[in-house]
Amino acid sequence: MRYFRIIVTKGDDSKLSKLNISTTVSGDIIVTHLIGKIKTDDVYEWFNGFEQVCQQFISEGRKYKLLVDRKGYTPDHFSVQKAWKDKFFNETILNHSKAIAFLLEEGEILNYLQQSNTKESVKFFDDYEQTLVWLNGYPI
């Protein structure tokens, strides 16, 4: 008699987004990506680039809008999310931003954030084009 072992896994690693921890500028919008299977070291590397771009605006006395793309963000460990929060919620960086748009995966977390958000200058989206339309229309 033969036995077969069936292993059921959740998710499919082959569908994980490729690592992207870049930050770019388009006019007065800073676009930062934190996508893929993210480790704590990736957060630190991402923040170094992100902070440099923000500091350029700050040193010139310019305000900016942020597009934070975390669509496809998968933390490698629970400590990754804490590291991201500790780095991103930086008083200097946030005080110089006029608007922040978060691009996230569609689902319960996005729905919760959209429904519970009370700040006019912060919005949550699952569509890149809608995110850009809102940011471009937001006054600086």
Predicted segments, located by residue:
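Amphipathic, Lys/Arg-enriched alpha-helical "gate/interface" segment within cytosolic domains
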Residues: 2-140
